């Protein structure tokens, strides 16, 4: 039995299959964890969604920002982004079932047995483990069983950009969603900056990656995340695993085998920027 993590798919189905073939993935014995953003700019978003769903208990994803945007478009809250290639999902006969399944995926996965945390963008620098898990559960409860339409309709905001345990209602839920699905750079006072998406060397001096801030949790439990394609080939602290290596940007897809921490990569098999 082996445990694998893979970076953002974003509709890059062929590369995922090549990686799974290379490691001889066996869904009856192995487990595949995905860091979110199953869909968006690649040409096989429907295939990615259907495949991960078909694996059942052999796979576990978390929600990424593109996954949430797909749900928002399904609810007629937002329009499909010009570069997103998701028409096949909307035309699928089981469209409602696919969106229902996606909406029931978590924001955070914690395994005590395997000793990891996984989310799409990372863990807020102001959260300990208990807070991260309770915040994730709070929003997951609404997405899965509550007034998810109202939440998704009102989640598009960059405020509040700083955590406080006193946050309530939509402000609190927006912060939680942004921390788990959109966070990259922060100011030294832990405020989020959503404008900068550049490589680390090109970032303004006042900004630092979330994982370089002082949070004891970052050293207590290994954290696996995606979301940040421009981190490709950048060093990260011990126990911080950044798996989005920009396959949909014509770079490569990265898979990590957890037991021996061996990486596997697959270059993009097509020029996605041509679409």
Curated annotation (Swiss-Prot):
InterPro entries: ApaH, Calcineurin-like_PHP_ApaH, Metallo-depent_PP-like. The keyword Hydrolase applies. The keyword Hydrolase applies. It catalyses: P(1),P(4)-bis(5'-adenosyl) tetraphosphate + H2O = 2 ADP + 2 H(+). It holds the Pfam family Metallophos. Its EC number is 3.6.1.41. Keywords: Hydrolase. GO terms for molecular function: bis(5'-nucleosyl)-tetraphosphatase (symmetrical) activity. PANTHER family: CYTOCHROME C5, PTHR40942. Belongs to the Ap4A hydrolase family. HAMAP family: ApaH (MF_00199). NCBIfam families: apaH, PRK00166.1. Hydrolyzes diadenosine 5',5'''-P1,P4-tetraphosphate to yield ADP. This is Bis(5'-nucleosyl)-tetraphosphatase, symmetrical. The gene is apaH.
